[in-house]
A protein has these predicted regions:
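Feature captures the catalytic ectodomains and active-site-proximal regions of enzymes
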Residues: 1-178
Length: 178
């Protein structure tokens, strides 16, 4: 999916795209990956399996935005759908004076994380590529974005068969600093 998005960006914009990979955090699930993409010195997990950055919760977009605001850069975090539903003037106001804007898009997770819909994950990837291509236009045209980084909090391996118990790790294996 990343390669397809990169190719589409090059085809439809006057810009360039570079595709790089890196090691995902373990376990490779959304709440850990989103925390790993935030600035901070430490990532930890409490007994309720909440992921913390420098002791601060990362559960909600508001909490992740607070972590961003603790850095010297002027920044904000927002959900993709919230940004999309804003009027043009509201989006411009949101981006005014910001050095960094985190836009969270989770349509693949929303489909792939649930057993009844996980077989639709490939369609969700195509939808995500279309939506991300569209949001790029908003970032460039309305938010004056020039350097845009599209990241993934984790990858996924899709199988048509359920995982064996031996493929899973007990949650008790994770506690404290990661």
């Amino acid at each position: 999916s990343a390669s397809e998005l990169s190719e589409r960006i090059v085809r439809t914009t006057k810009g360039t795209a570079e595709l790089e990979s890196m090691q995902a955090i373990f376990p490779s699930i959304t709440k850990f990956g989103m925390a790993a993409l935030l600035p901070g010195r430490s990532i930890s997990v409490n007994d309720s399996m909440d992921v913390l950055v420098d002791g601060n919760s990362t559960r909600s977009t508001l909490e992740r935005s607070a972590i961003l605001n603790a850095t010297p850069k002027a920044s904000v975090a927002i959900q993709y759908n919230d940004l999309l539903n804003m009027k043009k003037d509201e989006r411009r106001e949101l981006g005014a004076g910001k050095d960094v804007i985190y836009i969270y898009h989770n349509s693949i997770d929303a489909i792939g994380d649930k057993a009844p819909t996980e077989s639709k994950v490939f369609d969700a990837c195509e939808t995500a590529i279309q939506e991300l291509s569209g949001i790029l236009r908003i970032i460039v045209n309305e938010l004056s974005g020039t350097n845009i980084f599209i990241t993934a909090d984790h990858g996924f391996l899709y199988t048509y068969k359920p995982l064996n118990e031996s493929d899973k790790i007990d949650r008790k294996a994770f506690s404290g600093n990661v």
